[in-house]
Amino acid sequence: MKFSVLTLFPQLVWPYFEDSILKRALEKNLFELEVLNLRDFSANKYQKADHTLIGGGAGQILDPEMVENALHSVKNPKHTIFLSAVGKPFKQTDAMRLAQKKHVVLVCGRYEGFDERSIELGADEVFCIGDFILTGGELGALCLIDSIARHIQGVLGNAQSLENESFENHYLEAPNFANAVFKSKEINKIPAPLEYSKGNHAKIKQLKLDLSKLRTKFYRLDLFKQHKS
């Protein structure tokens, strides 16, 4: 699988892949990463990347011809995602679905975002990562890549670790407790559930499901109501 990131600030993207799981996955060629500087596709000799808004208003928007040129430079087949606050919220089911694609292109917004024609002409999907505003789409793109890459075979050392994670079964992950002895009196005042250490895997599984539902009801009542059974 390949990810292509189109951004005005490539230097914000690469450092995320210099450590840990995703670095190892790249080194093993489990996925490819391409980062393109949008300014390189500006028709302006000074590589101007933005324009004022028709009708007035504060801020600038990205040059739609620059975005178009950049997208044309990326080979097909590709699935193009624009990162924008106006997009639909990205969910775990989206990560699982997109992990089946061969090539995902992520276009990072800046300033006041995109000319609407860029979205109409270039986007297969538009996503946001929450109901808040960031200075650019790079963090959103990194979130999507991280979430999608976890579902690529071989990226995680233990594929089973995906099964019990939050949102995999529509509920938040059950509480976890370290298998260790601690000196801290405060930590020891809060014992882990005894059932966790008894070795009865069927009972542990049921307890974790029950705790998962309780945690979801407490932290994310919206999710709990959607999937209550």
Swiss-Prot record:
UniProt-listed InterPro entries: Alpha/beta_knot_MTases, tRNA_m1G_MeTrfase_C_sf, tRNA_m1G_MeTrfase_TrmD, tRNA_m1G_MTases_N, tRNA_MeTrfase_TRMD/TRM10
Enzyme type, top EC level: transferase
CDD domains named among the record's database cross-references: TrmD-like
Catalytic activity: guanosine(37) in tRNA + S-adenosyl-L-methionine = N(1)-methylguanosine(37) in tRNA + S-adenosyl-L-homocysteine + H(+)
Pfam short name (any one): tRNA_m1G_MT
Predominant location category: cytoplasm
Subcellular location per the Swiss-Prot or TrEMBL entry: Cytoplasm
One Gene Ontology MF term: tRNA (guanine(37)-N1)-methyltransferase activity
Transmembrane domains' residue ranges: none
UniProt keywords, alphabetically: Cytoplasm, Methyltransferase, S-adenosyl-L-methionine, Transferase, tRNA processing
EC assignment: 2.1.1.228
Tree of life domain: Bacteria
GO cellular component, one term: cytosol
GO biological process: tRNA N1-guanine methylation
Binding site for S-adenosyl-L-methionine: 109, 129-134
Keyword Membrane: no
Entry function: Specifically methylates guanosine-37 in various tRNAs.
Complex formation: Homodimer.
Family, as annotated: Belongs to the RNA methyltransferase TrmD family.
Protein name as catalogued: tRNA (guanine-N(1)-)-methyltransferase
Originating species: Helicobacter pylori (strain ATCC 700392 / 26695)
